[in-house]
Amino acid sequence: MAWQQLHLQCEKDNVDLAEALLLEAGALSIALDDAGDQPLFEPLPGESPLWDEVILTGLFDATTEAGTSHVIEQFSHEIAAQVQASRTWVSAVDDKDWEREWMSNYKPIECANDLWIVPNWLTPPNPEATNIIMDPGLAFGTGYHATTRLCLDWLTEQDLKDKVVIDYGCGSGILGIAALLLGARHVYAVDIDPQAVLATNQNAARNSVDNRLQAFLPEDFTIFCQQQDIPAVEVMVANILAKPLIGLAPYFATLMASKSRIVLAGLIESQTEQVTEAYQPYFALDPKHAFTAQEDQHWQRLSGTFTG
């Protein structure tokens, strides 16, 4: 398979916006690199510091329309203008196992309340903690991205004991697995990417929770719900993008139990108002419904309680 890479250089304050725009344009993965020679020292737990100047590299499938050179050139100018990129360029690359290529960059991450994400090739720094053992494979959700951490932090604050959870847009399965390790009874994980369904099942097995997690493509989950009398969902985690979140609001409401909880992520600051309007008919949003990670100024988290 042929691949194209779009490279953008911008200031760190615009990295989150650039990531969101690259994902919306069809990027399959995004890598961040130092644009200069600036050292980063050991961060505090939960922090992910960035260099002052960052090079973002979005990987596109060249066999799709979004990955053709002329399309990338076209939207690269639009993205560059929005994030004030100092330079952009496009390069062609050979097929590689990109997650394995970047394996050396992964390290254990400490989240809130003694929750750790540990790559499966490394030893947990704290064996007594709640450790999520992950191999991200080709699916989104390593724990490094701000949207994942925002959801993980929220999960550690919830009463998940014996709860039924949906992880919608599950990626690697990290959020659903975290919910199970934090006490949930059962998780239904859903993603549009077959690779994500595979990665979720594999990661669930690594964490010995595969007997309490079922992963589906959306159409298969719909059929499953029609054929099975599944219990009403008590907690929903949806870490995707603003546009699908807005469209899914009525559907999510049909799955929820009375007074169930929901968290939405994958939003940048300018998108929260539209998403809030879509969910207010069904959910009482928390007073501090827009939470911004200190080190990731653009990414937002919305949460609330089902009122149906």
Curated annotation (Swiss-Prot):
InterPro entries from the UniProt entry: Ribosomal_L11_MeTrfase_PrmA, Ribosomal_PrmA_MeTrfase, SAM-dependent_MTases_sf
Reaction catalysis annotation: L-lysyl-[protein] + 3 S-adenosyl-L-methionine = N(6),N(6),N(6)-trimethyl-L-lysyl-[protein] + 3 S-adenosyl-L-homocysteine + 3 H(+)
SUPFAM superfamilies in the cross-refs: S-adenosyl-L-methionine-dependent methyltransferases (SSF53335)
Pfam families: PrmA (PF06325)
UniProt keywords, alphabetically: Cytoplasm, Methyltransferase, S-adenosyl-L-methionine, Transferase
Enzyme Commission number(s) from the entry: 2.1.1.-
Annotated compartments: Cytoplasm
One Gene Ontology biological process: methylation
Keyword Transferase: yes
One Gene Ontology MF term: protein-lysine N-methyltransferase activity
Gene Ontology cellular-component annotations: cytoplasm
Signal peptide feature range: none
Protein origin, superkingdom: Bacteria
Binding sites annotated in the UniProt record for S-adenosyl-L-methionine: 148, 169, 191, 239
HAMAP family reported for this sequence: Methyltr_PrmA
Family: Belongs to the methyltransferase superfamily. PrmA family.
UniProt function note: Methylates ribosomal protein L11.
NCBIfam families for the chain: prmA
Protein name listed in UniProt: Ribosomal protein L11 methyltransferase
Organism: Psychrobacter arcticus (strain DSM 17307 / VKM B-2377 / 273-4)
Primary gene name: prmA
